[in-house]
A protein has these predicted regions:
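Carbohydrate-associated surface elements
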Residues: 53, 167, 189
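Nucleotide-activated donor-binding/catalytic signature segment of Leloir-type glycosyltransferases, i.e.
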Residues: 256-276
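Short alpha-helical donor nucleotide-sugar binding micro-motif in glycosyltransferases
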Residues: 275-276, 283-288
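Short hydrophobic beta-strand element within catalytic cores of glycosyltransferases
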Residues: 313-316
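N-terminal subdomain of nucleotide-sugar transferases
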Residues: 1-57, 61, 65-71, 388, ...
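Aromatic "clamp/platform" in nucleotide-sugar-dependent glycosyltransferases that forms part
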Residues: 296
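Conserved donor-binding/catalytic core segment of Leloir-type glycosyltransferases
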Residues: 202-237, 246, 407
Length: 496
């Protein structure tokens, strides 16, 4: 028995990651899929990614490390999600799964249409499936109710579910009525070497030492708390004459930010960068002293980890899974309310002043003499100022922050934990169709019957496609050798 288990654990798996959210788009899901795939390849597995086309980027592309990506042409709807069609994608997914000898289909993000459709088609083909949820959703609004019902349908017949935080796990278990035993909490991570703090003595702006710079990198949408940001910036700028904001990202709330900047004449203190690429993130972060996150709901928030790794102090709303992400000494929490965000950001600004001047007592005098701040008044303890003195508290220095984050988060560890889930799923016996239909039927009095109809039609299509296009006649894609790739790459950069 032991030898059988050991041989199963050492198997090389063929994994297909499916999501609507992938590079060249940037975000937490995109970063997770890319980095996790790279580390799984290094662990000896075969990984391909399937996503929809981005502009003129379609067809098959190879990324670094031999990661193969299928950019499938598909009509899009709001938020970069593909148009739901249920069955029209079956043939192309089937061809990809057969060509790549896929054993496990791993879908990412509840908002991804490709993810739901790929899992449905994979189960009809008898493949093992895993789902990773990257978001938190409510239970009261119409969109949440509909998506939760769809999620329950998809997850009724999934081998295992991964959530990026324990809060997200509880949320997903409730939304989809799942057995907690088949749900695991595996967080995101970062490549710490890509988010090094600014070297000591390095000057990016000639007047940078005069300013306390607050960085905001986010999609400019309601869910990310942009309304709170719009009302908080003028109050902070009124109180602190040496504070400026750098905001990166795009979204419908950019108009509100531009109007706020015009109304309060803050053009020289609020910089809007627009859409940024992944390669620009570190360069923007090291320009700042504080990273501000105003999200109304968040399962993990990879942005605050990247900011802490670059040595920034973090101010964040205390929502969702954020309290699980970083130690308390690295960030200042605030309620998702205007007054609380202003108060928390104000306290952190004074800490930065103390860190920059290394004169905590002088900053404390500034606090007591400041009369311009409107309500609420800052509540700053002696401990706040003691913590801000980087001379006496090395664990609060930027490089110390980086080292702590580096020790906490590693994609290699995440890949190992994900691999453990795969080996668990691959050993689950395949249930008969009638058992799958029983699971779908339990999704609701009306919805259950509809889901059963969808599953039966999908199964019949699978049978029809096998008659028309037998799997034996589909050409298998040649294997990509990571060893040869590394050898050729080495000879290219270091010719003999």
């Amino acid at each position: 028995m032991t030898s059988k288990t050991e041989s199963t654990k050492k198997r090389r798996l063929s994994i297909c990651m499916v999501t609507d959210f992938f590079y060249p788009n940037i975000g937490g899901v995109e970063s997770h899929v890319y980095n996790n795939s790279q580390c799984l390849i290094l662990r000896g597995h075969k990984v391909v990614v399937v996503t929809h086309q981005y502009g003129n980027r379609n067809g098959v592309r190879y990324l670094a490390g031999g990661l193969k990506v299928y950019y499938v042409p598909a009509p899009l709807i709001v938020g970069q999600a593909s148009l739901p069609t249920f069955f029209s994608t079956f043939l192309i997914f089937r061809n990809i799964f057969i060509r790549e000898k896929v054993q496990i289909v791993h879908g990412h993000q509840a908002f991804s249409t490709f993810c739901h459709e790929a899992i449905l088609h994979a189960r009809s083909m008898g493949l093992k499936t895993v789902f990773t949820d990257h978001s938190l959703l409510g239970f009261a609004d119409a969109s949440g109710i509909l998506l939760n019902k769809l999620l329950k349908f998809t997850l009724s017949d999934v081998g295992h579910i991964i959530c990026v935080s324990h809060t997200s796990k509880e949320n997903t278990v409730l939304r989809a009525a799942l057995d907690p035993k088949i749900v695991s909490a595996i967080p995101n991570a970062i490549v710490a070497e890509h988010f090094m703090p600014k070297p000591k003595g390095m000057v990016l702006d000639k007047d940078s030492e005069k300013w306390v710079t607050v960085i905001v990198l986010s999609r400019l949408v309601y869910r990310k708390g942009m309304d709170l940001l719009v009302v908080s910036i003028p109050r902070i700028c009124k109180t602190f004459k040496n504070v400026r904001f750098i905001i990166g990202g795009e979204g419908p709330k950019r108009v509100d930010l531009e109007q706020m900047r015009e109304k309060y004449a803050l053009q020289d203190r609020v910089e809007l960068l627009g859409k940024i690429s992944a390669s620009q993130v570190r360069g923007i972060l090291i320009r700042g002293d504080i990273f501000l996150n105003t999200s109304l709901t968040e399962a993990f928030c990879i942005g605050i980890v990247e900011a802490a790794s670059c040595g920034l102090m973090v101010v964040s709303t205390k929502v969702g899974g954020i309290p699980e992400v970083l130690p308390k000494h690295m960030l200042e929490f605030a309620k998702p309310e205007e007054d609380d965000i202003v108060n928390a950001l104000g306290k952190t600004i004074y800490k930065v002043i103390a860190r920059k001047s290394k004169l905590a007592e002088k900053s404390k005098t500034l606090v007591s003499s400041n009369k311009t701040l409107d309500k609420p008044k800052f509540k700053i303890s002696d401990k706040d100022f003691a913590d801000s003195d980087s001379e006496s508290n090395d664990y609060m220095s930027p490089h110390s922050f980086h080292n702590q984050v580096k020790n906490m988060y590693s994609w290699h560890n995440i890949a190992y934990r994900t691999e453990t889930v795969y080996y668990k799923v691959i050993r689950i016996p395949e249930p008969p169709l009638i058992e799958r239909l029983r699971l779908y039927y339990g999704c609701g009095r009306v919805a259950g019957k509809l889901f059963c109809m969808v599953a039966v039609v999908d199964f019949l299509l699978c049978f029809l496609f096998e008659l028309l296009f037998p799997a034996s006649e589909i050409e298998v894609a040649p294997e990509f050798s990571i060893e040869k790739y590394n050898k050729v790459s080495f000879l290219f950069f270091f010719p003999i």
